[in-house]
Swiss-Prot record:
It is found in: Membrane. This is Uncharacterized protein C18B2.2. GO terms for biological process: positive regulation of response to oxidative stress. One of its GO terms (molecular function) is chondroitin 4-sulfotransferase activity. InterPro entries: Chst-1-like, Sulfotransferase. One of its GO terms (cellular component) is membrane. Keywords: Membrane, Transmembrane, Transmembrane helix. It is a single-pass membrane protein. It comes from the Eukaryota. The chain crosses the membrane at residues 8-28.
Amino acid sequence: MTNIVPRILGFVLFVLGAAIFLTEVMHSYHRFVKQSEEYSISNSNTDDAPTKKKQMKAFFSLYHNMDELKAQNSDVVQPRVLKGTAREFCNNTDHCIRPFLNHETRYRVAPDYKMAHCVVHKSMSTVITGIWCYLFNRNRFVRVDKQMNMSEWDKESLCRGDNTFRHLKSLQKKYNASEMTGWSLSMITRDPIDRFISGYVDRCIRVAEGPSPCNGCDKNMTCFILSEYERFKKQAHKGVLTNTFEDRHFYPQNWRCDIKTMRNKYEFIRYSSDASKELMEDLFKIARRQGIPEKELEYIENELTKNRKTSHTTAYSPAREFFQRRLRESPLLMEYVVRMFYHDFVILNYPLPEGF
């Protein structure tokens, strides 16, 4: 009997220790999720706008249930409100969303090669973050990848915090690069219409967050575009941006990456759903100039071309094709998308839609 008591006590202590350990692991995990999904937005280097708490998500197939999407988007196509060209109704008026608000910025750096890249949602941000993590710590990245066979999300989160800067000044101070001499500063840009459609199908159709997603419009694109335009306009007027998971995917590209002050320093790389074409050529041109060995470029090429269809890719789905056609065939909806993203077209040198 005397021998059993110590064993029982030892077992109880073991169970308690394990419970405490698992509790700490879960707390760490939830902290990680919160940090990963809730970014703050700065209108200056010090003042952060409040963040929206993480919500439950509902998933919807992009390949089935097309009858539901068609039923929710059966409203009559309306004519344009404003006539003339976009330049005529956007310049020096309040019809279009003003440029250069200071939305969240995330620079990923590879200091060994003096490379900094500003990531933007719906412009290959997940894949690019993984590549810059590889360039930041190649040995650890490859070792962990071999052990875990990491997904795109694993690769994106592996270095987060270690090679990420929210402000360009912090990056410059860390690496003594006030003038960014010898550094490459890059950003992937995307056609505003293509980016909007991708964001809409991904955030409002494929996965909807919270009890009233996408401005309470459910899956009706007309409702969402008109209400999102009004949201943009009010926030731009107040100079205070809200921080929702949806907003990060729709805010104009020119609100990111210190474009107002650093545009001339950037090397802009155009997004392509087929990364083996122009995008890879532009990226590799920069990489070779910065001294990245061919062996590492082979790894990057593999990352850009294999399994390019990440979990949030919407290309080629019936839902994507339906909403793209719906937008392009609606004069009113196209007008309001142009009003929201006019300055992206101009600043990033993309052609405006026909008729604008």
